[in-house]
Regions:
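Bacterial N-terminal signal peptides that target proteins for export
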Residues: 1-9
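A conserved short beta-strand
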Residues: 178-187
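A domain-start/cap signature at the N-terminus of enzymes
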Residues: 21-67
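N-terminal signal peptide c-region/cleavage motif recognized by signal peptidases
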Residues: 17-19
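Short glycine-enriched nucleophile-adjacent loop
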Residues: 165-176
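The feature captures the conserved acid-bearing segment of alpha/beta-hydrolase catalytic domains
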Residues: 191-267
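Alpha/beta-hydrolase fold nucleophile elbow
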Residues: 150-161, 182
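Serine-hydrolase catalytic machinery in alpha/beta-hydrolase-like enzymes
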Residues: 65-136, 140, 144-148
Length: 288
């Protein structure tokens, strides 16, 4: 049995935002007792260019096989979801949640800063530091993981939701070989009015093994969401007007450019509500 090291999560009221805002208000679930027996949970804090980060790491028992690694953004909230979603009857992956030294489920300002492309306009002024965050992953996160764990460098998976999914696109456009498999869950394609899309083709210079794009059904059909308010519907429609491409079109374009891409619409789920399902779909690929 493995020990459970400190995991200082605060539990918030259970609710998902019914809008396309980047930070779902989501209760952080405790890691299930059964998974605590299968994983050792570790934390490692980093300071990079005066910014503070925390890795949450789920370490499976040692085997003779190299480990498949899953890296997820928004680690404070989505790391425990990923650990709980692992199929215990299949080979266990190493799970790395990249988060912040914070008790918040979602560090709103930090994730906007770190996960987004540079863009003009007052609405985007607090973002645009994806290049810095990518360097942090390249220079600190990946070397630390590769030094301490025997991972299979041909089986490294990325998961990001909302702004995290947008950051996945940034990596694909600038350093696609950093991971081999990408899950872009409900990517915030409205950011910068779509100005982040490359002007050259193909958009991805080195094709990854696979890209999975997921989207909650109600994100594209918000008028069918039984719980949506008029204010939320207006905001979603405003976001739609800001984008130049939707998730379906993104998948189609990437396929036409020669990439292996799958698109999954998650039934009866909105932006925040689709997170657990998207993580499960990602893990099905990780553990196949």
């Amino acid at each position: 049995m493995f020990s459970f090291l400190r995991l200082p999560f605060l539990f918030f009221l259970l609710m998902f935002t019914q809008s396309t805002q980047a930070e779902p208000d989501f209760k952080i679930p405790p890691i299930q007792e059964s998974m605590k027996k299968m994983y050792q949970i570790q934390e490692k804090d980093f300071t990079f260019e005066d910014k503070h980060y925390r890795l949450f790491i789920a370490v499976p028992p040692k085997t003779s096989q190299k480990l498949t690694a899953l890296y997820t953004l928004d680690g404070n909230a989505q790391f425990p979801i990923a650990v709980n979603a692992v199929n215990p009857h299949k080979p266990l992956p190493l799970i790395i949640g990249i988060g912040y030294i914070s008790d918040k489920a979602y560090a709103t300002e930090e994730r906007m800063r770190d996960y987004t492309f540079p863009a003009e306009g007052a609405e985007f002024a607090k973002g645009g530091k994806a290049a810095d965050f990518l360097r942090f992953i390249q220079q600190d996160v990946k070397p630390y993981i590769e030094q301490h764990f025997d991972i299979n460098k041909e089986k490294q998976y990325f998961f990001g939701h909302s702004f995290g999914g947008l950051f996945g696109l940034y990596v694909l456009f600038h350093q696609p070989d950093l991971f081999q498999h990408y899950t872009l869950a409900s990517p915030s394609l409205w950011w910068g009015n779509g100005s982040f899309l490359p002007q050259h083709e193909p958009w991805i210079s080195q094709k990854p093994s696979h890209i999975l794009i997921t989207l909650g059904y109600y994100e594209e059909h918000p008028e069918q969401d039984p719980n949506i308010t008029e204010e939320q519907l207006q905001r979603i429609n405003q976001r739609k007007q800001m984008r130049t491409i939707n998730a379906h079109q993104l998948a189609d374009i990437l396929v036409k450019q020669g990439n292996s891409v799958a698109f999954i619409s998650i039934p009866n789920k909105n932006h925040g509500g689709s997170i657990p399902d998207a993580i499960k779909h990602c893990l099905e690929q990780v553990q196949q």
